[in-house]
Structure formats: structure tokens, C-alpha cells
């Protein structure tokens, strides 16, 4: 939060948390408190979901904003409360919104004739009904003289007797003090006291609220106020109120002042299976999670099945006292030969011969094991509780130290096991310990033969580390896999002298690719030429043969035109490549003329390539010479980054700029101006001699074609070009005029520009021509 800002108010319902209800579910008797962490602020709120307006007059119909002065109650229904905190200097906080589901409850009205004694009797009766033995609420409210020393604000009633004597012993029963470790300061005498006003403590605002508390809630509050945590290990305080030591770390814990419940006897405390809390087992439900404890008193592992004898013929389980099977009436095996399926698992084979039985499931485990391998229970400890061998106090099963005397009870498990094994093997142990309370099992152990023992070395380091041979094998596999991937990614077909033919088109393509690669490697000129153009997808491919040579022509789409020669080559191919693919006239119309172009010798081909390269170099040089500084500035002014200013264009033309100059893509300057929407520069360029019908590119479009392709954005350029007498009959490489392109776009405004220029008769004639062309297609 930034400095100087006002904290948002908090909307808090003043009630005891109800189990099974959310925080926003309250009733119409619940008080709502609003407060802000920023001091000296006023809180304004609304109950209809509107924004609080503190500057308007509050309480009127047009404004539903109220000023908070004391806790309020809400009507029943779904209420949306919005509150804002405002400081004295009109600094505002954020608006906090809370939605409450308010239920209807009849108001708790206490008649005047009901005195405090009747109410206290009802609450005391409810407390005894919930199983609590201890203090009486009547004496707590009568002893209100000492409330300052106890830091507890109790509700006072005006009809209490003045000068009533109080008993100091009853002050020890007060459980709801602010600190459980506070020592009450008892006053020596008691005198008369004046009538006091009603307290505003939220904990005792409604005396009838204590009647609504269930036994679980009261026991939960008692558990939270009675049991603290250890200051050393933060473990929960022992359930025994007379415990003086922590059962986890053995540190002394301070005693709790005041009267407490009597300590639970042995085997009365246990872990709840639902919440895993240490709770008394003599209650019907868990005091923490309210789960039933009747089913938890006898664990599943202690539910033993009766001994059965399995029939070898049909597999039916029979009682152990029967001699014949109840299903097939076959003879059952004797008890020595029978396969018993009971509650105990078969013991594991041991090397040392020492075993111990689990007190929960009965499984035999090794004597050095700490936990049972079948159910996980700690070995050597009864299922109920553990008893300290020194003082006889009861502790829970997982306790490491005794809560009464503080000795370590964890190590006594092993001592008891070792002693039981020593007594069973008739071997005296070198220690003498007091007899433990745990009952050890006397197991007859067979004496092992000392002559059969031998020392065997084992290795525990690097068990799962691969050997050197395995690592070398993996390296070879990785190398071979890389070689296979390289061969597959860069497949080079074998160079053969003669292709197979006879329909093996894949081998034919491999032959062409191999010889083309070899030819490019051996001829630097061809390699330089083939590396220049940027080619797209393959448009067409033709094969011609005349008995001596085979000519293969591949036509690719060119991505970008970066030089004059390539532009002209593409323009030339626009008229010839399609005809070559269709085989109907042109330069390659006949097979003989097509083959004659490729029937020259190798030296003639090299010389021709050299001449083409020289012509290309000269064309680039001429183009560089044409791009004078004035032309470059003119192209920049009408380009995408320029502004198309008429005064600058006229100045550049006066300085010697060519109005017919072309950029690096061979686009005329007037076409560049049209494509960049600088229609103001078109009349200036036309007046200075620019060719308005100059064609460019592979499609041979004019400036009017390019303006028509722009659509609605090029309508101003179209009007300007038509005003400068641009030819509408000029066709591009596809045989389309600018008017045809306008009809294809379907823009009525652009079409009307063409119609207004040439008249309605010309429009009808062009439309008729267009319809005939579509019918032919």
C-alpha cells in the first residue's frame, strides 16, 4: 500500500463460527462491524449494491448511503454491502464489497422477569449435558469484581444482588481468559459495588448463544485454550494436564493454572483415523472432526478370522474342527498338513533365527526391525498405549519421552526386545535394566552352527552404474545412429553413365539430379547463374526428345525481381512458357526448333552464358548510372516513407530528376506514387513528361491497373489518372484492362468513375465484351 493511502474497511460478522456454514451465511440477528486500520476515518456504506456517495446528503431516497456509527444488522435475503473509508481531509480508500446470505431467525427476546440465575442454570444444565465437568457459569458472572485482573469482559446484569460475596476458588474455573497462563490477582475482601452498565464484549453479547454450542464446539474451544505448544519443538501439549515434560523433545513445559479435567486413564487417548488428532476415545464422536469413534475403537488389523482348512479338491474353506468338506464331502487334510488362511501371515525366513510378533496383525518380523512389514505398526508396543517403566504414566504410542518424568521411552523398545531374545536363548546380557511394562515374547531360537559361518564382502557403491563395455556399446550405437541420420537427411543419388529408363521414373529423377549437381560443380558460370534467382514452386515441366537429345524444361515461379535482366526474362517467359507446356506454337512450338536451341556444343553454351553474364553486368551498371541522386530523392519522396509533397517533387524535377525513372524493382515513379497513395504527385509527373501508360513487372500492369487493384483506397488515384487521360484500353499480360479489374473487384464507386469518363455507351460495349469472354470460358 502506498504512503498516505487509506486502508479499505473490513466488514466482520460478530458471531461464533458455525460448523457447516460458510462465512457469508448469517442470520438477521447477527451484528456486522465495519472498521479500518487507518485511524480517524469515517465509514460510509450501502446495502443495495450501489456505490457509496459520501459527499451527498445521507439517508434520503435518492441516496442510499449511510454513515457507520455502530454495528448493524441486515434484513433477510441476499444483501450486497459496499463500504468506503474517508479521512478528514477527504482522502478515500477503495470500495470493499461483500455479499451475505441472510437467513431469517426469530429475535432473541429476554423477558424482564427472567433473572440471571435462571439463564445461568440453563447454561449450566447444557454444559453438564455435553459432558463437561468443571466450573459453573453462575459463579463466573457473580465474580465480576475481579474481571480486570482476569482481563475478561463479562456481561453484567442490572438485577444482580449488590454486595454479594464471591468465592476465590471459583475463579480458577474460568476457562475463557485471554491467556491461559495468567495468574488471577485475588482481592482480599469484597464489598458493595454500584450497579454497572451492560458490557459490549462480543463473546458474551448474547447469553443465549452458549446454549447453541454443541458439545464438540465446547470441547474444541476447551482444547484450544487448554493445550498449548511446546516452546522448543512446537509439538502439541500433552493431553494430560498434569504432564510436566514434552513427549517429543523431553523439555519441561510450564503447568497450566486453574482447575482442569481429570487426566485420562490408560488407553483412553488415541489417534482419530479421519483427522489424525490425538483425542479421547471415551466419547461417541471425535472432538475435532466429529467423526464417529465407535468403529475406530477396534482397528481393522485386529479383526481376526477364524482358522479355516482349505479343501484340496474344490478349494472351499471349512471350519477347523470338521474332517470332511461341506461342499464335496472330500476328506480334509489334518491340522499339520492343512493350509490355514487366518489372520496371521506366515513368518519370513530369517538368517539369525530371531523373530518378534506384531501386536496388531500377528505377523512375525525380524528382531532388529522397528516396524511391522505387514501393517506398519511399531514392534514391541501394545496396540493400546505405552506405559512408562519408571513412573507408570500412560503416554501415546508415538511418544519419545515420558510426559511425567521425562525419561526417554523410545530406547526401551530395543532394550526389551534384546532382553527377551537373551532370555529365550539363555544368554545373559551385560546390562541390567528395570523391568519394562511391555510384555515380551519368549521365542525358542535354534542354536546356529558356528562352523558354517563365513565372511562375504558386498559392494553397495555403484550397483546401478553401467560397466565399461555397456558404455562403449552405447557410444557405438549413438555413432551408428548419427551416420544413418546423416545419410537419410542428405541423400546423394549415385552418378551413373546411363539412366535405366523403362518406366523407372524415380531412378530417372535420381539420374537427372546427380548429373545436374555434377554439372554445377564443374561449371562456375552455371553455378553463379543458378544461385542468383529466388524460385518458388514448380509451375510446369516438359520433356522433348528428337532421337539425339532430350530437352527438359522446368518453369518455377520467381519470388522477387531484383534486376532488370531477370525481369525481362520473366516477361519473355510469360508469353512462351505456357505455350511450351501446352505445345501450341511460340518459340518452342515445334520439337525441332526446341531441340535446335539445345543442340549446340558445350563451347557455344559456355560462350553464350558468358555473353549473358556480361550483358547482365552491363545492365546493372547502366541502372546504377541512371539512379542519380535527384532520381533517388524523387523515388524516396513518393515512396512509402515519403510524404508526396508537390513542392519538393517540382524542385527535384527542376534540378534534373527524370520523371520516367525506375526504382530497384523496375517500377516507374508514377506507379510508385500510385501504390503509395500519393495522388497529388501524379499531375506534376505527367506535366513534366512522365509516361502515364508505362508498363512494368511480369504482369505488365500500368499505373491505372495498380490503382484499380488498390480498391476503395485507390479511388482518388483512379480519378486523377482518368483526368490525365490514362488509357483504359491498355491491357496487361493477362489480357485484362483496368475496367476489367474494376468489374472483378465489384466496387460500384470505381466502376462509376470509369463510366463517367467514357460515357454510358462505352460502358455497355465493355460490359458486352466482358460477358462474351465469360461465355467462352
UniProtKB/Swiss-Prot annotation:
| Cellular component annotations (GO), alphabetically ordered | cell projection; centrosome; cytoplasm
Q: Where does the record place its ANK repeats?
A: 442-473, 477-506
Instruction: State if Zinc-finger is listed as a keyword.
Output: yes
Q: Where is the composition biased (Basic and acidic residues)?
A: 161-176
Q: What are the residue ranges of zinc fingers typed DZANK-type? A: 230-289, 358-406
Q: Which domain of life is it from?
A: Eukaryota
Q: Its Gene Ontology molecular function terms?
A: zinc ion binding
Q: Bias regions of kind Polar residues — which residues?
A: 193-202
Q: What is its main location?
A: cytoplasm
Q: Which InterPro entries match?
A: Ankyrin_rpt, Ankyrin_rpt-contain_sf, DZAN1, DZR, Fn3_assoc_repeat
Q: Name one Pfam family in it.
A: DZR
Its assembly, as annotated, is: Interacts with NINL. Associates with DYNC1H1 and multiple dynein intermediate and light chains as well as actin-binding proteins.
Q: What does this protein do?
A: Involved in vesicle transport in photoreceptor cells.
> What protein am I looking at?
Double zinc ribbon and ankyrin repeat-containing protein 1
